[in-house]
Swiss-Prot record:
Belongs to the UPF0305 family. InterPro entries: DUF2115 (IPR019215). It comes from Methanococcus maripaludis (strain C5 / ATCC BAA-1333). It comes from the Archaea. This is UPF0305 protein MmarC5_0909. Coiled coil: none annotated.
Amino acid sequence: MKSRKFFSKLKEESYDVSIFDLMNAKVYLEKDMAYLPEDYKKGYLEDFFTFFPEVLKEIRNKTEEELEDFEIEEEEIRKVDLRLFSMGSKRTGRDSYEKLVKTVINYLIFINKRPLHALTTRFPGGKQIIEKNGNYYCPIKNAQSNELSICEFCICKDLNEL
């Protein structure tokens, strides 16, 4: 699939994400993170619900003409979507969360080629993503060997490569 066509689809999906979806997604994620340390959870939620709405706005404001048109393997898109839909619990708010995450993550991976977390996100140990000379380095890139993780699709390199 051509990137402009895929972007057009993502842009359309971005308008399906309402303020109510953002609120439901936040409640969902708060419950899904219930057993994490409070300070980590609070920071993660703040970053997530600042970053993802900003990316949604970016998608809505961008035009196809601004993008380079290149080929994206549809199998890779399917792999990402399958991974996204298998993450987390199946509780109330899941649909809103999936709608938001599917649109934003696919845009970041395939169109914008940026990290999947905000650069301000603090990971366990207080580390965060570093940008240097146009490359991104993540402290948890190689630590996520879980088959449900989407780290393998992220543009970040492992922090140890810096």
